[in-house]
């Protein structure tokens, strides 16, 4: 009986990994609404991701956008007419927006948590940076992530109303000039 249980558990785990990998391989774009929590602050908005390395998120209440254009990551604050630039490779988003990183993580590592609703994987790099990625256990939909920002704040990002493989024009990932704000 114990052998059967262990065999069926490992088969089940291998089966969901295979399905998750297949689903990710066929995902080229994601559009979704989000809830972002940093400390006690909650923000809402919408995002578009186009693999590899493109992302745009709008925070309507804050009049703020973030854009990853493949090389740079920019935080655009329209209210203050400011743009802050960062090398994309130095941010946790680089690991999230490069689909091969996620596929490698799933193929080569076991989930850190599997509960009744969620599958969680954790990516650690440079011995201190962590990115936790969450998937729905039943649908295998991407649910969100958790990381730490440059100021050591925990950042949780939860997705809802997800649309997969819709057409997203590349021009939305253009970082504006400061005079255009």
Predicted regions and their residues:
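Hydrophobic h-region of N-terminal signal peptides that target proteins for export
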Residues: 3-12
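Cleaved targeting-peptide boundary
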Residues: 11-22
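A short, Trp-centered hydrophobic/proline-enriched beta-strand micro-motif
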Residues: 22-42
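Short, solvent-exposed coil/turn segments at beta-strand boundaries
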Residues: 26, 48-54, 68-72, 116, ...
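Short hydrophobic/aromatic-rich beta-strand segments that constitute the beta-sheet cores
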Residues: 34, 55-59, 73-76, 121, ...
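An acidic-aromatic
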Residues: 47-95, 155
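Flexible, surface-exposed loop/linker segments and immediately adjacent secondary-structure boundaries
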Residues: 79-119
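Gly/Pro-enriched, hydrophobic low-complexity segments
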Residues: 104-181
